[in-house]
Every structure is written in structure tokens, then in C-alpha cells.
């Protein structure tokens, strides 16, 4: 699986959690905002939740979240978005590949369940 070296994931932490990222008004009914994503990451911390800021080069362009689901023997790929200013450039596809690579490298599960809220 080829991954764009300009895309990287950084764990959400005390220095980056306030980065202002959002989707367009039309997309808000379908995508959790940054605050709700962080709340879900906190709520699922016992399920090894992993919340990431997605960077293209050194620019934050989006966020993603997944966590373990032992009852389904899978990772739940719960939240993902690319900021409206950076959509349409293939960054979401590349970042998704990188998240899936992280899951594969972790190796706990062989299955991914997509969550649609």
C-alpha cells in the first residue's frame, strides 16, 4: 500500500487539540465536529481510542478517530474528516490509507467496521 510521505498523523495532545478544523455547513449533518470527535475519543479511551490530527506537510488538514471493539473483533473507524479548505485534493484518500496502515501495524484485529452517525 503506497502512502504519500507528505501526509502524516499526529496523536491529539495538549498542544494541538485546539487546531481550528471544520467541514462545510452542508457537511455538518454527516460529520462530527472537532469537539464531538474529541469527546468520543475520551469516552472510548478504555477501548484504546486513537484520535489523530492529519497533517499535509506541516499544515493540519483534518482529523480521524478509531478504537477497539472486542465484541466485533474489529477496529471501529468512527470519525474522519478533511477540513473544507483542503478537500478535493486527494488528502482524505491518502490519510485513510495511513490510518488503515496504522491499524494493520497494530495487528490486534483483522477487521475494520465503519461507523456512520
Regions found by a protein language model. Give the residues of each.
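Glycine-rich acyl-CoA binding loop
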Residues: 88-93
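Conserved GNAT acetyl-CoA-binding A-motif
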Residues: 105-116
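Acetyl-CoA-dependent GNAT
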Residues: 2-78, 83-85, 96-98, 102, ...
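Aromatic-flanked redox-active Cys/Sec active sites in thiol-based oxidoreductases
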Residues: 82, 116-117
Amino acid at each position: 500500500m503506497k502512502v504519500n510521505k507528505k501526509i502524516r498523523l499526529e496523536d491529539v495532545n495538549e498542544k494541538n487539540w485546539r487546531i481550528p478544523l471544520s467541514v462545510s455547513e452542508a457537511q455538518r449533518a454527516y460529520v462530527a465536529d472537532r469537539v464531538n470527535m474529541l469527546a468520543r475519543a475520551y469516552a472510548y479511551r478504555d477501548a484504546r481510542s486513537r484520535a489523530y490530527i492529519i497533517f499535509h506537510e506541516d499544515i493540519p488538514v483534518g482529523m480521524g478517530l478509531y478504537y477497539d471493539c472486542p465484541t466485533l473483533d474489529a477496529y471501529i473507524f468512527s470519525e474522519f474528516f478533511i477540513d473544507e479548505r483542503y478537500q478535493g485534493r486527494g488528502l482524505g484518500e491518502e490519510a485513510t490509507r495511513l490510518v488503515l496502515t496504522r491499524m494493520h501495524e497494530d495487528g490486534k484485529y483483522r477487521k475494520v467496521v465503519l461507523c456512520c452517525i
